[in-house]
């Protein structure tokens, strides 16, 4: 009898712990009760990765590594590290999450820089190995702690992938003197390993809304074949440890070219696109809606 009681208790615990977890159901995102969840989100831009156009530094230091170089020239390595620590500590805080909840938001998309989680390939003592850093994970842990009491979902967005995912260095910290994500198998392997580690850490957290695998790729990738290959490799890594959370897929050309990325290769997947500097009319979405209807999947903007 004791074994039966323990088994029932475990089932109850797991079911209860995932009661708010999101998954796809046809063209909708729903919680575990089958209730549709319309994600109303905010992204703390500039928090984990400084983007020159946001920081108003484009004219002299567009990408984060360039901003950091200028600061080192100004005040040295030690003070620059202190500055970045204080920046991350104060740029986005519990007060911000409390305010977002009061304003009606129910999701936060966290733009992550890979170098807060692991070393660049150029700094690894042994090529091909991964040195893990707790800083990035601790930042996510903090947001989850702040968000959960407000029923706010946290979506993890790889904003700066190893090597950088596009020539627009301001948004992904690409350094043209080093191999990009698309020029280096070592960088791609590191990205897969990083996502697998992230998924393993948060696989049981119901307030993780999902994994946005690569933000705004913008690179000449014929037929998006390599992009799809990397997405599929990441998916395999994630699913090896986490069968539950949604996977968000952005197209090339700043998230909007999904050619070669359909049909879906996972049954819990959402296609994501970005929309800038245009009118807010239903007809403006005619180009993307066929993906939803043809493949019976949700879209996320």
Q: How should each PLM-predicted stretch be described?
A:
Residues 38-50, 106-112, 116, 154-156, ...:
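Structural recognition of the beta-strand scaffold that forms the well-ordered cores
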Residues 46-48, 114-118, 162-164, 217, ...:
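Feature marks short, surface-exposed loop/turn motifs that line or immediately flank catalytic pockets
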Residues 71-85, 94-129, 265-279, 289-301:
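Long, low-complexity, intrinsically disordered polar/charged segments
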Residues 52-56, 122, 165-170, 222-225, ...:
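Short aromatic-enriched loop/helix-cap "lid" or pocket-rim segments at secondary-structure transitions
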Residues 1-19:
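Bacterial Sec-dependent N-terminal signal peptides
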Residues 183-301:
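Extracellular glycoside hydrolase catalytic/binding regions
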Residues 22-23, 79-108, 116-118, 124-210, ...:
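An active-site-proximal structural segment forming one wall of the substrate-binding cleft
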Residues 18-105:
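N-terminal carbohydrate-binding accessory modules
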